[in-house]
């Protein structure tokens, strides 16, 4: 049986990581085999690349270098962890994937969407998530949550205009792929959001099982 690849996306501070862990706990309790991971990172090599990308000391990093580092981390991640887990029939829950690169480096930095998408399709051999949950959080609320959290990484330090372009990019992707990308209101309480997320994921998994 082929596994299921589920990703979560959205602005920084939207609560994706917390919700993904709660979802993993619930699915494990339901008897599913879960692999929970994140980008950039997910592997030993990917985590080293992550430290380069996010380090605030590297403000001189060229934008194309940033794009390629994300893709390099993703290539390692897909081949070392994600594809083997899917081949074993597991559910992979991933905090960010290619949609993030399209939103942040495509819409955010102003590179063509086709260019960013092409680089990442080569890096992943065209792997696409089965289901993506896009956490909808305004730029102002995202910024406030990040400030409350403390020190900002190199990407989080970018200005509000960048954040707005990223947000608009995510919303555009949701319109373009409504079957795959499900919008989630990130302003809900943790409990309410978790109830909504778990309900949809379990419904989706049961549907896939019936069709398999």
UniProtKB/Swiss-Prot annotation:
Record-linked Gene3D superfamilies: P-loop containing nucleotide triphosphate hydrolases
Keyword Transferase: yes
UniProt keyword list: ATP-binding, Kinase, Nucleotide biosynthesis, Nucleotide-binding, Transferase
Biological processes per GO annotation: dTDP biosynthetic process; dTTP biosynthetic process; dUDP biosynthetic process
EC number of this enzyme: 2.7.4.9
InterPro entries reported in the protein's UniProt record: P-loop_NTPase (IPR027417), Thymidylate_kin-like_dom (IPR039430), Thymidylate_kinase (IPR018094)
Top-level enzyme category: transferase
Any one GO CC term of the record: cytosol
One matching Pfam family: Thymidylate_kin
Transmembrane annotation, as ranges: none
Record-listed ATP binding positions: 10-17
Catalytic activity: dTMP + ATP = dTDP + ADP
Molecular function terms, GO-annotated: ATP binding; dTMP kinase activity
NCBIfam families in alphabetical order: DTMP_kinase
Summary of the function given for this chain in its UniProt record: Phosphorylation of dTMP to form dTDP in both de novo and salvage pathways of dTTP synthesis.
Protein family per UniProt: Belongs to the thymidylate kinase family.
Database matches in PANTHER family: THYMIDYLATE KINASE, UMP-CMP KINASE 2, MITOCHONDRIAL
Name the UniProt record assigns to this protein: Thymidylate kinase
């Amino acid at each position: 049986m082929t596994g299921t690849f589920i990703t979560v996306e959205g602005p920084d501070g939207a609560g994706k990581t917390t919700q993904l862990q709660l979802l993993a706990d619930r699915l494990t309790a339901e008897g599913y085999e879960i692999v929970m991971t994140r980008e950039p990172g997910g592997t030993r090599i990917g985590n080293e690349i992550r430290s380069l990308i996010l380090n605030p000391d590297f403000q001189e990093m060229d934008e194309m270098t940033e794009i390629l580092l994300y893709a390099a981390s993703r290539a390692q991640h897909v081949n070392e962890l994600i594809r083997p887990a899917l081949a074993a029939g597991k559910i992979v829950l991933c905090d960010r994937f290619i949609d993030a690169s399209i939103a942040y480096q495509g819409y955010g930095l102003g590179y063509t969407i086709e260019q960013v998408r092409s680089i990442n399709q080569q890096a992943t051999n065209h792997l696409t998530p089965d289901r993506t949950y896009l956490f909808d959080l305004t730029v102002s609320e995202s910024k406030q949550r990040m400030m409350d959290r403390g020190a900002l990484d190199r990407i989080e330090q970018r200005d509000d205009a960048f954040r707005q372009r990223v947000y608009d990019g995510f919303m555009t992707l949701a319109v373009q792929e409504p079957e795959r990308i499900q919008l989630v209101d990130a302003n809900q309480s943790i409990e309410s959001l978790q109830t909504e997320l778990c309900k949809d994921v379990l419904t989706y998994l049961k549907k896939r099982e019936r069709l398999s």
